[in-house]
Amino acid sequence: MIGHVRGRVQSIEPGGINVDVPGALVRGVGGTGAAVHGELVVAVHDPGEELRAGAIDVGATGKIVVGGSRASAETLTRARAMGVAGIVLGGVLDKELRDFEAIQRRRREVGGLSGSFGVLLLEGFGKVGIDPQRFAWLKGHAGSMASLFGADGLLYVYDAEVAPGRRTLPRVGERVIAHRRPFQGRAGVLVAELDDLHATPSGIQVRMGLVRFEDGRLAPVPLANLEATLPVPPA
């Protein structure tokens, strides 16, 4: 049995074991596929760049590849065929993910699949760039060993300092990330909390915050759709 995680066993329970992992945990918003492990590599130059099929070659075999804003079904299929262990993305289009999973089911039915493969989404669904703060941290740990749990939306990077964190209920003045359209995946600063309740496009009355996004746009966003980004603590 392969556990795909490295660490010290703390306890054994019916149906599983608890392991203390010497590294940093990055939580995504979702994912798919099996648990995998491999060396972390970055295949894009910019967190908003799309991961193209041409960026996947034999050098990526057995590795966990960090992409950018999305990957097509063609790119995911090529990565799977080349023996890539896993893919980390800001987001992915629902249709692309469904098409990829349909291809995998057909290949599995005819016995054409071997090994495991996982996909982790860090920011959301659709074309969503990785938060630059997170991307810089991942890039700084290229070459480290990592374990990816696609279905659980988790990435462990071994022997790494604490990753940039997130917190709900952001406060005025904090850097935030939006998690719903039309601003999904975009970063900015919460400059004010609006008084009273305000209606969303769907008609629901919610508390809103005023966010100045990094492109200079000022927009109201439901506070429930925002997370504060926490800086990496000094070593």
Cite the ranges covered by each PLM segment:
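Short, charged, surface-exposed secondary-structure boundary motifs
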Residues: 96-104, 129-132
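Conserved anion-binding
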Residues: 105-130
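Beta-strand/loop-dominated core regions that host nucleotide or nucleotide-derived cofactor-binding catalytic loops
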Residues: 1-57, 62-64, 69-70, 91-95, ...
